[in-house]
């Protein structure tokens, strides 16, 4: 055996050039990807949330709340217009 494996000290990781080369690319890329995901409206489509202009319609100006947990499906159908 060559010896026990030892964890690398965190200060060594933070001061290494390799750490900053990798993270200076990935952190901004993740930020930009998240911003594009939300700003293009893809987040609304993926998670099924209504867009800000779809919360209130001409016919319904109150908040679309589900109030009866046992008849929730009927309320959702009524609120969505299906």
From Swiss-Prot:
UniProtKB keywords: Chloroplast, Electron transport, Heme, Iron, Membrane, Metal-binding, Photosynthesis, Photosystem II, Plastid, Thylakoid, Transmembrane, Transmembrane helix, Transport
A Pfam match: Cytochrom_B559a
Membrane topology per record: Single-pass membrane protein
Gene Ontology cellular-component terms listed: chloroplast thylakoid membrane; photosystem II reaction center
Localisation: Plastid, Chloroplast thylakoid membrane
InterPro entries recorded: PSII_cyt_b559_asu, PSII_cyt_b559_asu_sf, PSII_cyt_b559_CS, PSII_cyt_b559_N, PSII_cytb559_asu_lum
Alphabetized PROSITE patterns for the sequence: CYTOCHROME_B559
Membrane spanning stretches: 21-35
Main location: plastid
Cofactor binding description: With its partner (PsbF) binds heme. PSII binds additional chlorophylls, carotenoids and specific lipids.
Single GO MF annotation: iron ion binding
Cofactor(s) the record lists: heme b
Domain of life, source organism: Eukaryota
Residues reported in the UniProt entry to bind heme: 23
Coiled-coil region list: none
Biological process terms in GO annotation: photosynthetic electron transport chain
Family designation: Belongs to the PsbE/PsbF family.
Biological role: This b-type cytochrome is tightly associated with the reaction center of photosystem II (PSII). PSII is a light-driven water:plastoquinone oxidoreductase that uses light energy to abstract electrons from H(2)O, generating O(2) and a proton gradient subsequently used for ATP formation. It consists of a core antenna complex that captures photons, and an electron transfer chain that converts photonic excitation into a charge separation.
PANTHER family found in the cross-reference section: CYTOCHROME B559 SUBUNIT BETA-RELATED (PTHR33391:SF9)
SUBUNIT field: Heterodimer of an alpha subunit and a beta subunit. PSII is composed of 1 copy each of membrane proteins PsbA, PsbB, PsbC, PsbD, PsbE, PsbF, PsbH, PsbI, PsbJ, PsbK, PsbL, PsbM, PsbT, PsbX, PsbY, PsbZ, Psb30/Ycf12, at least 3 peripheral proteins of the oxygen-evolving complex and a large number of cofactors. It forms dimeric complexes.
NCBIfam families listed in its UniProt record: cyt_b559_alpha
Protein name in the entry: Cytochrome b559 subunit alpha
Organism: Chlamydomonas reinhardtii (Chlamydomonas smithii)
Gene symbol of the encoding locus: psbE
């Amino acid at each position: 055996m060559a010896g026990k494996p030892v964890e690398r000290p965190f200060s060594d990781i933070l001061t290494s050039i390799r750490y900053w080369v990798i993270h200076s690319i990935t952190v901004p890329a993740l930020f930009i990807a998240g911003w594009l995901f939300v700003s293009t409206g893809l987040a609304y489509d993926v998670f099924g949330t209504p867009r800000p202009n779809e919360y209130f319609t001409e016919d319904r100006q109150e908040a679309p709340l589900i109030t009866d947990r046992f008849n929730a499906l009927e309320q959702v159908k009524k609120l969505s217009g299906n």
